[in-house]
Design a protein with these regions (language model features):
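Post-signal-peptide N-terminal segment of Sec-exported extracytoplasmic proteins
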Residues: 9-15
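Loop/turn elements at helix/coil->beta-strand transitions in domains of secreted/extracellular proteins
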Residues: 126-129, 187, 235-237
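Short, small-residue-biased leader/transition segments that mark boundaries at the very start
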Residues: 2-7
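Short beta-strand edge/turn micro-motifs at domain boundaries
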Residues: 63-108, 201-209, 213-260
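Extracytoplasmic/secreted proteins, especially bacterial periplasmic and envelope-associated proteins
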Residues: 13, 21-28, 107, 111-114, ...
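Sec-exported extracytoplasmic/periplasmic mature domains
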Residues: 16-19, 120-124, 136, 140, ...
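Surface-exposed, charged secondary-structure patches
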Residues: 22-76, 155-219
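Juxtamembrane and targeting peptides
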Residues: 49-126, 130-164
């Protein structure tokens, strides 16, 4: 009973340190498997436009099938020094890909990193309302899934017929996502090899190509995600295009900003 009271008290204390959205994310985080801090954190702080980003708290999250994910948890504090966002950080190569874009200012680079971290974390923590809010009502959405198959020989390349593509409206995509959230014990996304290009029109509109490893309790795949996102208002990103393909097409390469 004493330990339960201690935990409950600590959660109460945590609420006073967070904004409403920050506390909602915290509650989802502590329900994400069995979480624990795995090493002494070496925090790094970055101030941008009055907000402070704190990286990174190393944590592991274990699920019932012994599947474990290791994440660097990132905190964003608002101008009142309250935790406004919790996210799973990008790995160092992915961050470096964006930070090395020296033609962009620090604000742009930080907005892009924060967006990608919020995006991947929203799927892991099943933040349905947030995901619904960032997709444009008329977004172009193409999903893909790798079908189960038996290769004739070990190591044989997968045929194109083994991948199913589906074009969906936003409402169709969100309905399917809701089912996935309800039926999956866990979801985890890993990003790598990202390329970001700025559109020549529309202000802060970016095309993001990124390699995605998708893990869930019932399905997994690796492929290439493309997002065309409007970041003119960094607090309210709008995704206009979301596509997925399992590998680079030998004739056309990856879907990118030039296709739209």
């Amino acid at each position: 009973v004493g330990s339960e009271m201690c935990i409950r008290d600590s959660f109460t204390d945590m609420q006073s340190l967070c904004t409403e959205s920050g506390y909602e994310m915290f509650n989802r985080l502590i329900k994400y498997g069995q979480g624990k801090i795995i090493s002494e954190p070496e925090f790094r702080f970055l101030e941008c436009n009055g907000e402070v980003t704190c990286r990174s708290l190393p944590m592991s999250f274990k699920f019932s099938n012994q599947r474990t994910f290791v994440e660097d948890v990132v905190f964003t504090l608002n101008k009142e020094s309250k935790i406004d966002c919790l996210s799973f950080g990008l790995n160092k190569p992915a961050v470096d890909d964006i930070m090395n874009q020296t033609s962009w200012n620090d604000t742009v680079r930080n907005v892009l990193i924060n967006f990608l971290e919020s995006y991947k974390t929203a799927y892991a923590l099943k933040r349905y309302d947030y995901i619904n809010s960032i997709f444009s009502d008329d977004a172009l959405i193409i999903t893909g899934s790798v079908l189960k198959h038996t290769a004739a020989n070990e190591g044989q390349a997968m045929s194109k017929q083994a991948v199913k593509y589906t074009r969906q409206t936003k409402s169709e995509y969100m309905k399917k996502l809701q089912h996935i959230f309800r039926s999956s014990e866990f979801i985890n996304l890993r990003f790598a090899d990202n390329q970001v290009r700025k559109s020549g029109v529309g202000g802060e509109i970016y095309g993001i190509q990124i390699k995605q490893d998708y893990f869930s309790s019932s399905y997994g795949d690796t492929g290439y995600l493309f997002l065309m996102v409007d970041l003119n208002n960094p607090k309210e990103p709008v995704i206009h295009v979301r596509t997925w393909q399992p590998e680079k097409d030998p004739d056309f390469g990856l879907i990118d900003l030039s296709h739209f």
